[in-house]
Amino acid sequence: MATISASLLRAPAQLRAAHRAAAPVARNLTVRAMGKEVVATDKAPAALGPYSQAIKAGNPLYVSGQIGLIPGEGKFAGDTIEEQTEQVMKNMGAILEEAGADFSKVVKTTILLADMDDFKTVNEIYGARFPANPPARATFAVKTLPLNALVEIDCTAYLD
């Protein structure tokens, strides 16, 4: 469910229509709007729907779920859990970098797996990015992921 600011709800109908029709955020751009900054980079895949790659809201950075797509190509890095997890972590790293952060700033992640049997393999690849003080985390097995991905990971990071 979308959240609309109170000021936008009070705006004339034409302004609300113009807001809805606004062009998508340009790539490699940080845009300030309504107290938040949209973070976007072409070094990670474009969002598959009406959401941002990441949002800065004060010091927290919220990175949307990443799947193993190769940026600019729209295809998976491979068919294996290893290939897709490596690409997920590359995509997440690119978004963190665009926002001025890195994996050491990540405080929480959520991992979605198409098959819980991949838990150990994902942990090995994931753990290489967090060798000390890993973030809090939840992991779930789900029925289906976007584009039939094998893994999706989102994160929250803290910015200095």
What are these model-predicted stretches?
Residues A2-D160:
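Short, polar/acidic, helix-capping and beta-turn segments at strand->helix junctions
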